[in-house]
From Swiss-Prot:
Gene3D superfamilies: Nucleoid-associated protein YbaB-like domain (3.30.1310.10). It holds the Pfam family YbaB_DNA_bd. The gene is ybaB. HAMAP family: DNA_YbaB_EbfC. It comes from Escherichia coli O139:H28 (strain E24377A / ETEC). This is Nucleoid-associated protein YbaB.
Amino acid sequence: MFGKGGLGNLMKQAQQMQEKMQKMQEEIAQLEVIGESGAGLVKVTINGAHNCRRVEIDPSLLEDDKEMLEDLVAAAFNDAARRIEETQKEKMASVSSGMQLPPGFKMPF
């Protein structure tokens, strides 16, 4: 099924991939992205662990409806979370792209 040394090579590749993924996860945790709503009037900065680092609100919104401002903050946070998820997927895909796996084989991590 795996050929001579195939299983050993596969295990070695899995170990290397796991190390790369650990490093990538550490890098992702350090990333920061900015989500926006209201055409940039509300900005939320989060890190790769989805922790909110900063919320910026344009002063013109402070005079408006409280409910609208709350909605804009939530929308900006959701935009930032979506951006972090996209970045994580791109970075993780780059880690696993070089690995030669048998058809149908799925990694546990």
